[in-house]
Structures are given as C-alpha cells and as structure tokens.
C-alpha cells in the first residue's frame, strides 16, 4: 500500500511553492511548473521522496533510533508537538536554542534545573518560600518548560532530525550537519536541498500540508517501533 497518495497531497496544498522571485535554483528538479507567479511542486517527486524518508525513519526507529522533530514557525508548532508526542519522540517547537546539539551538555544542565524546579513544586518546597521568590522560580520553570519541554527526556543526541523549513531552522541544520546527524526535511522552493539528506519537496507554510507530512513521519516512527520486537523471518530452505 502506498504511504501517501497524490490526492492527499493535493488536498493539503503540498504542491504550492513560493513566489517565483523567492526561489532557490537548486530546487529546480522538484518544480513542475509556474502558475500565477507561484511555483508548483512536482508531486510525483514528492511521493517518491516521502517514501524514501519514511523508509529511513521507519528503519531507524526499528533499530531503536530517536528522532528530534523541529518546527518553530507558527504553522508548524502544534503539529510538531502533537505528532512527536504521538510517536513518543522529542521536539523543539518554540525556539531553537543555539547549542541544543553542539553544546548538549550545557542544555542538559538546563533540563536538570527544570526537573529540579518541578520536584520543588511537587514536594511542596514552594509553599515554604516567600511569595516573591516563588513567583520568580515559577517564571523560570515556565520559561525552561517552554523552550526545553519537548527534549526533557532526551538523554543523548538524536539519531536523526526531522525539520520543517530548513531555511528558518538553519541553526538546527548547521548543528546537525556538524555532528553528522542525518536530516529529513520539508523543503520548499526557497530552500537549499543540498544541506538535507532526505528532501521532502513541499509547502512548508500551509498548516494542513505541514500536518500531513509531519504525521507521515510520525507514522514511520510508530511502524518502526512496532517492528522492534519481531524477529526477522528465517529463510526457508527447500
């Protein structure tokens, strides 16, 4: 069964690229035509590229690999959080903090501080402190939760990144490339596909398009997880 259909892609508006004056010539192989000043993405290429990305994520997940979902633009925030949580993976959906990957130990210390504040509140320590100090600590906890909540349980570097709009998330892309972490991304007509290992040519601005493509990557994770405990079938010798 096909992972995704042309009909689904069309209905979600995945084929709409950016205005022709805002394009990266490297995306030319993925462009079907131009209509009313907007590039139309070749969905036949998109279907194939989704399958490649899906298979990569599924196999990675089957081997116990972890994926970090990244999308901080408004159109992506909700989908990234919901789909990452649905498949039990990590996410960054508010702001990418520089060094999230390349300075991971420092980020881990901030996460430990977040967990410490959570413990203090759960254990009733806040009840023993002056109101002003409690307000300050709660503010600190909320800020840390906002930026780091999606990677709170990420004990080590991820095995792959799934990125919505690599142009906007260029710091995440740069960190992933520097560390040799494979990158899967929704790449619109204004992005550089050369920086991405698994390019999914598509509209990165429409909420429905982003949700559809993100959900497919989450499906790949889940399929991989379901295959983890199943031993491979032994070859039958005649």
Swiss-Prot record:
GO cellular component annotations of the record: cytosolic small ribosomal subunit
GO term, biological process aspect, one: translation
Pfam families: Ribosomal_S2 (PF00318)
Magnesium keyword on record: no
Record InterPro entries: Ribosomal_uS2, Ribosomal_uS2_bac/mit/plastid, Ribosomal_uS2_CS, Ribosomal_uS2_flav_dom_sf
GO-annotated molecular function: structural constituent of ribosome
Superkingdom of origin organism: Bacteria
Keyword field: Ribonucleoprotein, Ribosomal protein
HAMAP family registered for this protein in UniProt: Ribosomal_uS2_B
Family indicated by similarity: Belongs to the universal ribosomal protein uS2 family.
Protein name, as recorded: Small ribosomal subunit protein uS2
Gene: rpsB
